[in-house]
């Protein structure tokens, strides 16, 4: 799973004995409509409604992920190990609001941890360094958007997290023929 403020990318991978994988299912949860601003104070009824609506929908997304885990009989759920502190990101007021105030990352992570302990699958937190870059380079194409490509890379890392020498994938020039730049 690739967690972003506006989108959650999900991919379900199946690995064989040779550590090769195929993508069984991929999905994007679009949360951008939930992140609108009310242009009112945080104590206003509309602002409280939007905040509660956002939290409810994020919890529903977690339940949908859990349904997919049960349907595909997954044994591991791989997420990014994020520890982002609130700060000025120097990309504008709207971006800072989205990353620091609106994004309920811990709500999603804690709910997924709770569901994994109830339903018995392993939750693996992986280092997200360059997951978007590597994911787009190796798996990105017109049918696989950015958040799906990085979720594939996060899943690949999570599958072999404790194996030595498996963090970065093997790169070949054939991966570049799908790229548009």
Regions found by a protein language model. Give the residues of each.
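Positively charged, helix-rich recognition surfaces that bind polyanionic ligands
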Residues: 1-181
């Amino acid at each position: 799973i690739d967690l972003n403020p506006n989108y959650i990318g999900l991919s379900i991978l199946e690995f064989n004995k040779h550590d090769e994988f195929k993508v069984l299912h991929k999905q994007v949860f679009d949360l951008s409509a939930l992140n609108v601003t009310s242009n009112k104070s945080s104590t206003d009824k509309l602002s409280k409604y939007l905040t509660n609506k956002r939290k409810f929908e994020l919890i529903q997304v977690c339940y949908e992920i859990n349904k997919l885990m049960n349907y595909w009989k997954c044994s591991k759920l791989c997420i990014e190990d994020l520890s982002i502190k609130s700060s000025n990101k120097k990309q504008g007021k709207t971006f800072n609001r989205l990353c620091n105030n609106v994004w309920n990352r811990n709500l999603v992570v804690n709910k997924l941890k709770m569901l994994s302990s109830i339903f018995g699958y392993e939750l693996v937190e992986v280092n997200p360094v360059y997951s978007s870059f590597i994911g787009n380079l190796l798996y990105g194409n017109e049918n696989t958007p950015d958040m799906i490509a990085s979720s594939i890379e996060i899943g690949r890392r999570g599958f072999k997290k404790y194996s030595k020498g498996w963090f970065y994938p093997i790169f070949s020039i054939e991966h570049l023929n799908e790229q548009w730049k």
